Amino acid sequence: MNKHYPHYLDLQPAMHAKGVVRLPGSKSISNRTLLLAALADGTTQIRDLLASDDTHVMLMALQKIGVKWEQIGESQDYVVHGVNGAFPVHQADLFMGNAGTAIRPLTAALAVTGGDYTLHGVSRMHERPIGDLVDALNAIGTHIEYTGEPGYPPLHIQRGRIHAQRMQVRGNVSSQFLTALLMAAPLMAREQDVTIDVVGELISKPYIEITLNLMRRFGVEVQRDGWQSFTIAAGQRYISPGIIHVEGDASSASYFLAAGAIAGGPVRVEGVGKNSIQGDVRFVESLQQMGATITMGDNWIEAKSNGALRAIDADFNHIPDAAMTIAVAALYADGTSTLRNIGSWRVKETDRISAMTIELRKLGASVEEGEDYLRITPPAVIQPAAIDTYDDHRMAMCFSLATLDGAIRKGSKIRINDPQCVAKTFPDYFTAFAKVTEDSLF
């Protein structure tokens, strides 16, 4: 959060990657937990909340709408005083940065509870779609208007009148739209059941599992019919569990586990393990397919390898964020790798399919860019390059891996432009990466 990086970082080639990394808290769990704790009856202590731009945005927004919270000393433990479903402040201007995990659930909660709210963010946020969520909410009587381009933030929310207990939302753009409706549903289900129907295929299902798991911890059960229909029975409300612990971020784990797979390892991450509620732990299955050895404990995962990585051809619909790590690991494979069903990359922090294609080509890779797939053929030699990061934390973290020496080809000197963007989810990333690669960065 308050770590300041220079305008660029030069990373030197690294022969080895080994060590132990304590992961920061999960972004997905942190922002969901903050909103649920705010909506709950009672006071919640949140342990190991992620310190990042995205969680800061959520904390500031909650404060502006009257939710009281305190940080415990210098720790990442917070106390949130729940408002039992009724935000005390009914008029606010809320800056949401580029945090999809904040703006989408908050939009639904504020539209359902009612008031006069404006939500806006950085310019990229105003290019990230929110129309499916707004359509679903307005169809049942909320009052949300676009103040810029239709279908995108900024948004102006006014008090509406909810008149229906069944709603529909498309599932193929972002699972965060369904997450937002699910989290707001108990606020509408005071006297009648609420049902949410998903139109079309639902992407990123593991993120919905995180949502349902956390709602359960706050006392709300959701009945689901496959992945097409979700029902919240009447009369349920959020009740504080007292204390809730935030797991380490499984998406952040992917870079270090990939480093262990590429450069031998062993690299161990702590804070997430075999019982994780995050779907991104399944990233390790891809590393295993590529030839890495993975071991898992209750609260740790370790990766190592003893040679060349195999090329992979796989569907990554279920783990789109962690799949970016595979795109760079593919530089070290023995042939052409194909990442399929990654269309959601195009509406993330940047158009990640386009950005990944441009930057991998700088390193010498041959890349075929499809609408929802990437086909990556590694270069004979990884070329030194200055990598642009597109204000996208995952681009910066992924491409650090191109410095590693693998069994088939060696890493190169890599310049990361605008390394500060990692503050979105992992402010200390480059310090942690330098530790496992024994690079004297700072």
From Swiss-Prot:
Phosphoenolpyruvate binds at K27, G100, R128, Q176, R352, R394, K424. The active site is at D321. Keywords: Amino-acid biosynthesis, Aromatic amino acid biosynthesis, Cytoplasm, Transferase. It is found in: Cytoplasm. GO terms for cellular component: cytoplasm. It is an enzyme of class 2 (transferase). Its main location: cytoplasm. 3-phosphoshikimate binds at K27, S28, R32, S174, S175, Q176, S204, D321, K348. One of its GO terms (molecular function) is 3-phosphoshikimate 1-carboxyvinyltransferase activity. Pathway: Metabolic intermediate biosynthesis; chorismate biosynthesis; chorismate from D-erythrose 4-phosphate and phosphoenolpyruvate: step 6/7. GO terms for biological process: amino acid biosynthetic process; aromatic amino acid family biosynthetic process; chorismate biosynthetic process. Its EC number is 2.5.1.19. Monomer. Catalyzes the transfer of the enolpyruvyl moiety of phosphoenolpyruvate (PEP) to the 5-hydroxyl of shikimate-3-phosphate (S3P) to produce enolpyruvyl shikimate-3-phosphate and inorganic phosphate. Belongs to the EPSP synthase family. This is 3-phosphoshikimate 1-carboxyvinyltransferase. It comes from Herminiimonas arsenicoxydans. The lineage of its organism: Bacteria, Pseudomonadati, Pseudomonadota, Betaproteobacteria, Burkholderiales.
